[in-house]
Regions:
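Ubiquitin-like/PB1-type beta-grasp interaction modules and other compact soluble beta-rich domains
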Residues: 165-170, 196-230
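Ferredoxin-type iron-sulfur electron-transfer modules in oxidoreductases and energy-metabolism complexes
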Residues: 229-251, 261, 267-351, 358-374, ...
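Active-site loop ensemble at the mouth of alpha/beta enzyme cores that anchors a bound cofactor
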Residues: 111-139, 215-245
Length: 397
């Protein structure tokens, strides 16, 4: 199949990244990619969707991944998967010899392994420059559900009209279900039995980078999980704090320990983001050196600094996000052509173990099986948002 033909099929069937920002998948198909990489790292704690889907549909997904490899002419296809996903690895190994040029790369159980910049370095040794795209290093990254959606578009002529979503935490029966796009979060949560706390909060996405949602919010193409949490949970409290309070707390109790920078995944890959310098400058309203503010553009918002590193429970990630938003509104673009410094020699010792992260966040008790149910959940009506991805909104037909 030619690249243009596959691009047209993918675009016409509405396939975008099934997580993150929802980058249009057809735009990743280019003959500049000498390596394609499938992301099965489940970036966030408690998420199990991708390993479940890849185990259940291993052959179909691998076949499609190989087809993408041949279409773009990539010399190598890598499946990045955490070494603890034993059942999924076994399912892949049953078919791996059928696909020349494809290999598994086993990953450590650390966060944020699913960040594509981190994943690319782990799997290939290449460093994507600050503000750059993976294709600049000859790599195109796809997550598991996205590849499965390409399979359904090519083989079954099926557009993306449904989504796999995990429902976990304070529910009686944690589950991963297939639901129509546009159904409400409440309808999805109902598939997991009863909520087990009064006045639950729906946290959409993972605990590190997710957001607080309303029960009436619609499921979109990037909705991966709903965490049902008590209203007084640590994660909920952190999300509900205001920037003005965060800034005052930084000015009064930051101890200048530098741990937020020491553990920053992007900083350790040589990117110029430096949360400690930013917090010091912002807390003291110090504008003599603008670099800490400008370099906020290179923050990935992974949340390690805010949710794990800081012994004072400050909020570097939230303040950096506000700064990025302010720079965009002011028309200030990230510096172009910035090259990374050498990767930190101590990077291996600065990784965040996912098990320890879950304990720090008070999530360990929620780490339970959430079985995959593939029968499509039936609902009476849906609300389809036209903008479910990066770029121009879709058009109704």
């Amino acid at each position: 199949m030619e690249i243009k033909e596959l691009q047209d099929i993918i675009q016409q069937n509405g396939v975008v990244g099934a997580g993150g920002a929802g980058f249009p998948t057809y735009m990743k198909l280019t003959d500049k990619a000498n390596t394609i990489l499938m992301n099965c790292a489940e970036c966030e704690p408690l998420l199990k969707l991708h390993r479940q889907l890849l185990e259940k549909h291993a052959y179909e997904i691998m076949k499609t991944f190989h087809m993408i490899q041949e279409t773009v002419g990539a010399s190598e296809a890598i499946i990045g998967i955490k070494k603890s996903y034993v059942q999924t690895i076994n399912a892949l190994n049953q078919h791996i010899e059928e696909f020349p040029g494809m290999r598994l790369h086993l990953l450590d159980e650390v966060y944020p392994m699913g960040d594509e910049v981190v994943l690319i370095y782990e799997a290939t040794g290449r460093v994507v420059r600050p503000g750059g795209l993976p294709i600049e290093q000859g790599v195109a990254v796809f997550n598991v559900e996205t590849v499965y959606n390409v399979y359904r578009a090519v083989e079954e002529k099926q557009p993306v009209t449904d989504k796999y979503v995990s429902v976990v935490a304070e529910v009686s029966d944690p589950v991963t279900v297939r639901v129509p796009l546009g159904c409400t979060l409440e309808e999805v949560v109902a598939q997991a039995g009863n909520t087990t706390v009064k006045d639950p909060v729906y946290f959409v996405g993972g605990p590190m980078m997710g957001r607080i949602g309303n029960g009436s919010d619609p499921v979109t193409k990037t909705t991966n999980a709903i965490l049902v949490l008590p209203k007084d949970h640590l994660i909920v409290a952190k999300k509900q704090r205001t920037s003005s309070i965060d800034l005052k707390r930084a000015a009064s109790i930051c101890c200048q320990c530098n741990t937020c920078t020491d553990l920053c995944p992007r900083h350790n890959l040589g990117h110029p983001i430096d949360p400690a310098k930013f917090m010091r400058a912002a807390a003291n309203q110090d504008f003599r050196d603008l670099n800490p503010y400008i370099d906020a553009s290179f923050c990935s918002s992974c949340g390690v600094c805010e949710m794990y590193s800081c012994p004072q429970s400050l909020a570097p990630r939230s303040l950096l996000a506000d700064m990025k938003g302010g720079l965009r509104k002011a028309g200030i673009r990230p510096p172009q052509g910035v090259q990374p410094k050498p990767v930190q020699e101590s990077r291996e010792y600065r990784k965040v173990p996912e098990e320890r992260l879950m304990a720090r966040l008070g999530l360990t008790k929620y780490d339970k099986d959430a079985p995959l149910h593939e029968d499509l959940v039936q609902v009476k009506k849906v609300k389809i948002l036209l903008s479910q991805h990066i770029g121009a909104p879709a058009q109704a037909i």
